[in-house]
Structures are given as C-alpha cells and as structure tokens.
Regions:
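Residues at the C-termini of beta-strands that transition into short coil/loop
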Residues: 30-32, 56-58, 96, 117-119, ...
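Internal alpha-helical scaffold of NAD(P)-dependent oxidoreductase catalytic cores
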Residues: 85, 108-111, 127-179
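NAD(P)+-binding Rossmann beta1-loop-alpha1 motif at the extreme N-terminus of oxidoreductases
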Residues: 1-50
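Flavin (primarily FAD) cofactor-binding/catalytic cores of flavoenzymes
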Residues: 30, 82, 150
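Hydrophobic anchor at the start of a short beta-strand
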Residues: 7, 25-27, 92, 113, ...
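Rossmann-like NAD(P)(H) cofactor-binding subdomain of soluble oxidoreductases
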Residues: 45-129
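Nucleotide donor/acceptor-binding cores
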Residues: 4-6, 64, 136
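Short, charged/polar "capping" segments at the starts of alpha-helices
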Residues: 34-39, 101-103, 148
Length: 179
C-alpha cells in the first residue's frame, strides 16, 4: 500500500473535530447548507479556531483515507455522499459508536474498510465548540486480524498527524469490549 497523502472526513461532530483538526489538508464533506452554517460559525477546539476545507459530495475526487464520523442515524446518507471520494485504493475508517457501521460501509464499498473503534476521549461539544482533556485513540485493523500494508499505511499516517492509534489483530474484540 502506498503512503497516505490525501484525506477526507464526513461528520464534523465531536470525533470529526477531534481527529480532523490534526489531519493536514483534510477535506470535510458536507452539503451546501451545512457548509454555509460551518462557515458562518467556525469550529473552535480547546480555544483555538480550526480551519477546514469544505467540499460538497458532488465535488469529490478519490482520497487515500476517508474518516466516517457521522451519527448512526445519517450513516446511509453519508455512504451515498462519500461515493466520489472513494477510489480503488481508498481506505475507510469509521469512528461511529457501535459495531455495525463497518458492515454497512463494506457492503457499499467492498474491500475498502478497516474495522475501528475510537476510545478514551472525554470530548464535549456545544454548538461549534469542542473541549477535551483526553484525545483518546483510534484502534483499527483488518476484520480478519491480518496486519496488512494498508493497516501499516494508516498507522503511519495517523502517527504523522499526531493522532494516537493502535493497529490491532483483534479489532472485533476491541469493538465489543468498548460496549
């Protein structure tokens, strides 16, 4: 797997802000109405303004890594909205709570999903403002536990971004353990 250079995220709630602010050049996928709201009231994290590049689903071009951070209630719409951002080598990470989002994403985009779970953060969001003491980490891996080149590429990227992470050979256990 090649080095991850380009990224996008969908969902600018607590986890989207928490991780997205550390991803250089990340594209935040949102519809035009949401982009207008985000632009009118910029995101602030621990007192610092965050600058994001917003793009509509129609403007998408394939990226190396796509982070899905939406609420479960809008996952199906998000799966449609990310279509143009998915290429043959795109890796998708979902940080939704629960154990089913990866299955939904994998059904739509076979062979592109790494299973993952976000743990240990204490982020609180009020409007466009996020406050946290502990950023937590992303645990992730192949569903079958294999330590593949794409697992290593994601770990390298997250490390370069300063996002705590843990590649796992037992990611299904880690997901269930969070419950």
């Amino acid at each position: 797997m090649k080095k991850i250079k380009t990224s996008a995220l969908i969902g600018l709630g607590a986890l989207g802000i928490l991780f997205g602010r550390k991803m250089p050049g990340v594209q935040v996928i949102a519809d035009e109405d949401r982009i207008a709201r985000y632009s009118a009231e910029p995101v602030v994290c621990n007192g610092e303004a965050c600058s994001f590049r917003y793009v509509t689903p129609a403007e998408g071009k394939p990226v190396d890594l796509l982070l899905v951070a939406v609420k479960a209630t809008v996952l199906e719409q998000a799966i449609q909205d990310i279509a143009k951002f998915i290429g043959p080598d795109t890796v998708i990470l979902s940080v939704l709570n629960g154990i089913t989002s990866e299955e939904h994403i994998e059904t739509a985009y076979p062979g592109r999903t790494l299973w993952s779970v976000a743990i240990g953060m204490d982020a609180t969001r009020s409007g466009r403002t996020l406050v946290f003491n502990q950023a937590g980490k992303i645990q992730f891996g192949e569903r079958d536990g294999a330590m593949t080149g794409r697992v290593q590429a994601v770990a390298d990227y997250l490390n370069a971004c300063g996002i705590a992470n843990e590649p796992c050979s037992d990611i299904l256990y880690k997901q269930w353990n969070k419950l």
